[in-house]
Structure formats: C-alpha cells, structure tokens
Amino acid sequence: MKRLIVASTLLLSTALLNAAEDSKVTYVPAATVAKGGSLATAPNLSITIANRKEPGMVEVHDKETDTFYVLDGSATIVTGGTMVGGTDTGPGQHRGTDIKGGQAQRLAKGDVVVIPAGVPHWFKEVPSSIDYYVVKVIAE
C-alpha cells in the first residue's frame, strides 16, 4: 500500500509541477479520490481516476500525452499502429474501431504506460475491470 501511495504521489506531483507556471496548489481529499472522476485540471493538464469494465474505442489525441497508472485490475491495451474506422469526435480527438499493426501489452496493478500525442491506443480486453489514474498533458 505504501508503494501505491508513493507512486501515486510522485505521478501527481510530477504532472502538477509540469503544469502552468502560475498554478495554484491543488488538494484532493481521500473521499473525493475514492469516488473517482476528475481530480485536478489546469490549462495544459488533467488528472482523473478512471474505471473500465469493458473494452473501449480506439482513441487518438493530437495534442494530449496520456499517462496511465494502474491502481487495480487488469486489461490488454494496444498502442501504435494505424487506427481503423476513424472519425473525428472533436478538435484533435479521433475514435476508431480497431488498430492495425499495434502492439498489445497486458496491464496490471502498479503498471504505468505513457502514450505520446498522436499514438493510437485502445483497451482491447478488460477481463473484469481496471481502475487507473489518467494524467493528460496537453501541448500548446
């Protein structure tokens, strides 16, 4: 448990330190963290706790680097390659149905994956559920 707290703290601290220079201190009480959802936002940063119980769609973000830190559970994530069946869902946001030529990686508790902007990624298999921090760093 101590390792989880330390890793979580380091991950959050690193992200917040890389936020805008005039950022204010953000305190998130344990009760809020336990509920999941949005923990902190800044002009070039967002931190959330996500939960998945099933596979999602392929995602590509033109200006967002995603860092996932797995809190509990497991999943298979596919990264890289080429998105299939892509549609624009918003400025710089794209979703698709499959990835051709990507690399599959099993994620489990304690794992971290950093997905640079522009790289397709997809939770292809979620056997039961997965809880994870999402730190998004948004390029200007």
Provide a role label for each language-model segment.
Residues 4-6, 13-63:
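A short, N-terminal "cap"/entry segment at the start of jelly-roll beta-barrel domains
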Residues 62-63, 67-83, 89-98:
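Short, conserved beta-strand element in jelly-roll/cupin
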Residues 66-69, 104-105, 113:
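His/acidic/aromatic-lined binding-pocket segments of jelly-roll/cupin-type domains
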Residues 128-140:
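A short hydrophobic beta-strand segment most commonly corresponding to one strand
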Residues 49, 77-79, 132:
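Short hydrophobic/aromatic-rich beta-strand segments that constitute the beta-sheet cores
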Residues 107-125:
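Conserved metal-binding segment of the jelly-roll/cupin
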Residues 83-85, 129-130:
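Short, surface-exposed beta-strand-loop junctions and turns on beta-sheet-rich folds
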